[in-house]
Regions:
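Short, surface-exposed alpha-helical recognition segments that flank or form part
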Residues: 48-52, 70, 103
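Short, contiguous strand/loop micro-motifs
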Residues: 9-11, 44-48, 66, 98-99, ...
Length: 170
């Protein structure tokens, strides 16, 4: 787009507020190719130096019972790379990325419905660091765990933890 940085920032925020992701607005209003956009905005150069997995991450994940499915607004290449660098790729049964949701991000209701249908999820625990995503999950009947240091409470949050390894205390 041929616009100023200031206008781009406003447009980005408007699309984020309206669609839940900048990309969705760019696709709808500017015919932006989502694959080109994602490859540009999720450039993986020097990526290994930026990923710092939490201590006890593998132990924590291995102690989670049932199917473990990643549901992310990130692209597949980016997600796979993070999981591999963190040495936890093989610990997950499935990965559902922004491409799988037709570029419709969480917390969108249709995206959540598509995710649940694809993996035939009727019940489960949804863990996220964004409360809006948890609200959608709760609306679909899932239990919710919010990763946060916030002290506020919301009726759609079942549990709060500060870091993933806190799951070991359950």
């Amino acid at each position: 787009l041929d616009i100023s940085i200031e206008d781009a920032s406003k447009l980005r925020q408007n699309y984020w507020d309206t669609y839940g992701a900048t990309l969705k607005g760019l696709i709808k209003h500017h015919n932006i190719d989502p694959i080109d956009f994602l490859s540009t905005t999720h450039d993986l150069k020097n990526f290994n130096d930026l990923v710092m997995p939490e201590v006890n991450l593998k132990e924590t994940i291995s102690n989670i019972k049932g199917r473990k499915i990643i549901y992310t607004n990130a692209p597949k290449s980016y997600t796979d790379r993070i999981l591999k660098i963190s040495n936890i790729y093989e610990m997950f049964d499935e990965v559902f990325t922004i491409e799988d949701s037709d570029f419709t991000p969480k917390p969108n209701q249709a995206s959540m419905a598509n995710f649940l249908k694809k993996f035939n999820i009727k019940e489960g625990v949804f863990i996220d660091d964004i409360k809006e995503n948890l609200k959608t999950a709760k609306n679909f009947g899932l239990s919710t765990i919010w990763i946060t240091k916030e002290i506020t409470h919301h009726s759609f949050i079942d549990r709060k933890i500060e870091k993933i390894s806190d799951l070991l205390t359950f």
